[in-house]
Design a protein with these regions (language model features):
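Extracellular/oxidizing-compartment recognition motifs
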Residues: 1-99, 111, 127-130, 143-152, ...
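Alpha-helical support elements that line or immediately flank enzyme active sites
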Residues: 37-42, 110-139, 175-182
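Low-complexity, intrinsically disordered regulatory segments enriched in Pro/Ser/Thr and acidic residues
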Residues: 152-154, 172
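Aromatic- and histidine-enriched alpha-helix N-cap/loop-to-helix transition segments
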Residues: 32, 103-113, 124, 162-170, ...
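Alpha-helical scaffold segments in carbohydrate-active enzymes
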Residues: 114, 135, 194-205
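Extended, hydrophobic alpha-helical segments in both membrane/secreted and soluble proteins
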Residues: 167-178, 191, 195-199
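Hydrophobic alpha-helical scaffolding
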Residues: 27, 71-75, 105, 119-122, ...
Length: 220
């Protein structure tokens, strides 16, 4: 893959495919995020012409555009921006709220808060928000505070050994916002110990004057 830039090449979704038997039907096993696809034939037999036909892609998301609530009383350009933004959110709505379908596909605690707020105003899919909250709580650190990031595959685990102060501080607020939007008290009770642990963890970074210490042990 020829490219420019400094982003890790592991995030570039390129693929080398060998067609051993032709004609035939082939399906690529990975999930991709793209607007355009470039196909380059590197080598083929001299015994005939090579062609691809019937190419299709299957879109996957837990977001349902039939439930999408468009912005009300806005200009046409604002409505268009809102719809594109909702489509971006939909692409990140998989089994949890991913930080992006083309990047490392992690569930990040800070991204989750923004995505949840956007979901409440558009799709109102409380299930994917709830599952995401349970994931960061289920992969909590030893002190009970929520995970900063979570990988689901190949096995669900805490994806970052260090914590971001802002993200940890947001978790109790996210639980409150979820309750206000969904009315799901049982989930709040389940997450309450993690929310309290998040508060305790944040307070360890605050000095006697109420200011956050620079050497607080948090990442970033």
């Amino acid at each position: 893959c020829e490219r420019l830039g400094t982003i890790s090449p592991s995030w570039v979704q390129d693929e080398v495919v060998n067609f051993d038997f032709v004609p035939g039907m082939y399906e690529l096993p990975r999930r991709y995020a793209f607007r355009y696809v470039r196909i380059r034939v590197k080598q083929c037999s001299n015994g005939g012409k090579f062609c691809l036909k019937g190419i299709s892609a299957r879109a996957v998301s837990s977001g349902d555009f039939a439930k999408y609530t468009p912005i009300d009383g806005a200009s046409e350009i604002d409505k268009a921006i809102d719809r594109v933004s909702a489509a971006t959110l939909r692409d990140s709505m998989q089994t949890c709220l991913e930080d992006g379908p083309k990047r490392d596909r992690r569930l990040w605690l800070g991204d989750l808060r923004l995505q949840a707020l956007a979901d409440y105003a558009t799709f109102r899919d409380f299930d994917v928000v709830k599952r995401s909250l349970y994931l960061v709580a289920g992969c909590a650190f030893e002190d009970g505070s929520p995970a900063t990031a979570v990988y689901e595959k190949p096995q669900t685990r805490n994806a970052n050994g260090r914590q971001i102060l802002d993200y940890t501080a947001l978790f109790p607020l996210m639980v409150l916002e979820y309750y206000k939007e969904s009315g799901d008290r049982q989930t709040v009770e389940d997450l309450w110990p993690t929310a309290k642990a998040a508060c305790r963890k944040v307070l360890t970074a605050v000095d006697e004057t109420g200011l956050v210490r620079e050497d607080n042990g948090f990442w970033n």
